[in-house]
Amino acid sequence: MTVDRRGFLGGTAAAAVGGTAALALGAAAARAENTPAIGKFAFPDTERLRVLVTGDAGTGARPQWQVADAMREQHAREPFSLALALGDNVYEQGPWADDDAQFAAKFEDPNHDLDFPWLMVQGNHDNSSILPGDGGWLLRGDHEVAYHARSARWFMPSRYYSVRIPQERPVVEFFVLDLNPVAAYLPPLFQPYWAADGQFMTEQAAWLDRALDESTATWKIACTHHPYRNNGPHGNAGEYDGFGIDPIDGRHARDFFEAHVVGRCQFLLSGHDHSLQVLEPTPASKGTRQIISGAAAKSVHGEPSSGSKNTPNGALYENYNDLGFMVLDLTPMSADLGVYTVDLSNGQSANVFQRKLG
């Protein structure tokens, strides 16, 4: 996420699933028509999973490639099972069609040889309208759903969906959510379908409640672009960027998190802030731990500021300068998180944080 809220205001049907994962689609599933049949990379069927966690990557520029090179090195040493990409997949405006060349330049090419399923989350830049990242053209994000049918790697059968792995006695279920309608810089004020109490968000909430109630997975992990808690420049939901105006401060995103997510998932993984954060659970989060991995191509370059000063959060690890990614190792008995930073001067990666979180 690059657009600052203050600056903005001042200036202006799923494809086949391989492997033994089970898929649940949201009601907003989009169908890609007249696209070639593409075989998807298979989901793993083991109880030991190594999950690459990355976000805000889709620039196509050299730093993205350097971080991806470091990912490839890790994959060669200890293979990843799958990846989570936490939004802003196609900078700066998002795609113009499901066959846009940006998908190759900003996703497929940088991630070559990382041949496993990538669970994709929609970010504000993926839904841009007037200004890059304003989140004001939500239909633009449907091109990313349609691209699911064109890529072996890219997994986004709907704007929101869940995947459990393996299907029988699942170790984990990922709940991929789309909160762009309630977190946009250019909110959909005259589009009732996208309103906080409109059809899209109401159906998503009902779907999520049902899916969480029915889940038998050991680990339940929610995946969003916009975070609930955040010590970086964008701040916490309800305080986004320190700008207290309804709805752009994210108060409706906060309400969604508190009504449907926190206390029901062990982890909430988000991007949006170009930083690496492992936060402590708070009383408000009811035991859910917020993790932010949004530094796969850009960094905020400095100390946290703006909205985060309103209500800071305890943290096990914070980094607002370096690019990098995370690795989450899951078994039925444990969840271990590693944070890796990448030195852009030489391309070397370093494991700067390692902790058992569950």
Put a short name on every predicted segment.
Residues 1-17:
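N-terminal secretory signal peptides and thylakoid transit peptides that target proteins
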Residues 18-19, 30:
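Cleavable N-terminal signal peptides
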Residues 25-34:
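C-terminal region of N-terminal signal peptides and the immediate post-cleavage residues
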Residues 33-102, 231:
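N-terminal active-site segment of His-dependent metallophosphoesterases
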Residues 39, 43-45, 72, 91-220, ...:
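Extended active-site neighborhood of metal-dependent phosphoesterases/phosphodiesterases
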Residues 51-53, 83-85, 120, 222, ...:
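Residue-level marker for buried hydrophobic side chains located in beta-strands
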Residues 56, 87-88, 123-124, 177, ...:
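Active-site glycine-centered loops adjacent to acidic/histidine catalytic or metal-binding residues
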Residues 339-347:
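Short, solvent-exposed aromatic-acidic interface loops
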